[in-house]
Amino acid sequence: MSKITRRDFINHAGMYTAGGIALSASSLGFRTNQAHAQPMPDWLSLTDEAALEPDLPIIDPHHHLWDRPGNRYMLEDLLLDTSAHNVRQTVFVECTSMYRADGPEELKVVGETEFVQGVAAKSASGGYGETRVATGIVGSADLRLGDRVAAVLEAQIAASPQRFRGIRHRAAWADLSVTPNRAADAPNHILLDPDFRKGYAHLRTHGLTFEAWLYHTHIADLTELANAFPDTTIIFNHLGGPIGIGNYAGRRDEVFAAWKPAVAELAKCPNVVAKVGGIQMVVNGYGWHEMDKPPTSDQLLQTNQDWYHYIIEQFGPERCMFESNFPVDKLSCSYTVLWNQFKKLTVGYS
């Protein structure tokens, strides 16, 4: 593994995602019951850690914002979570938040970008502290529109010319034991769909990247897409979503064994970079949210380090970035604990 300091590694996300530093990406988002569940502050407070290396600058390339009945995660909530660490900038990733109520169906997604642009402007005023939230914005577009998606991409860019960086169109399909709500699922093998690929071709034309959210069973589809479009940057979300529930419950070693060669093959594509994190979700099967108290950073590291080390070895530190995936991963641990884990992981890198 190449040498890299914790400062370089933890602040590395800016090369691909933070507006004003470089670029980012996106895809239509992950929808499970977890994405709509409300984290429990009293439970999270049962595990209290001081932030390690609190002055180390961080760019968080993956979080969401929403205001849903009984489930609110807005600017003030994010800033409270990030306050213990030195989070300098963040990147918002689409989550079907604040879509337009009216107008053409394909353009309703632009409402989300308009909403986040407003949040980013509030943050940029300096009136909410030094953290600059949503310096990069990753939005949605239905790439299955083919050539017609160009108008959607142009509208998204127009809604936030300085911050809009890419598109996320979800490719997370799994069997019914994992995602029983098939209406919320992506079509199976969508990355191979000709109409999707016709729309995907417009990302490069518009200077946008693609953020890929899928499960480990479909990583090969992403590798094929990356090879077919070598000039489009892909950002690989959540380690490829290793599944640990439903028919995959109790099969972690088997999943890991299948995941490793798929990741190794994907890493051969120089146009793909990886987000390291996003595996504290319910779908990953660790059951943290069912414990009497949340995990410590040591517990997280002990459980996750084999996955983290392998993906970093395959992609190299220069093509990896740590992500929080908050508030989705907040069901399992606090922001402070999560980033303490990442800092402990990288101690040997400097």
Task: Say what each PLM segment does.
Residues 8-30:
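N-terminal export signals
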Residues 38-44, 243-350:
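H/E-rich (His + Asp/Glu) clusters that bind or coordinate divalent metals
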Residues 62, 90, 137, 203, ...:
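Conserved, mostly hydrophobic/aromatic
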Residues 9-10, 37-129:
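An N-terminally biased module of ancient metal coordination in phosphate/nucleic-acid-related enzymes
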Residues 54-57, 86-89, 130-136, 161-165, ...:
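Short, well-ordered coil/turn segments that N-cap beta-strands
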Residues 1-8:
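N-terminal secretory signal peptides
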Residues 39-43, 104-218, 224-227, 240, ...:
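Active-site gating/metal-coordination segments in enzymes
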Residues 46-53, 74-84, 147-163, 220-230, ...:
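Short amphipathic alpha-helices and their capping/turn segments at secondary-structure boundaries
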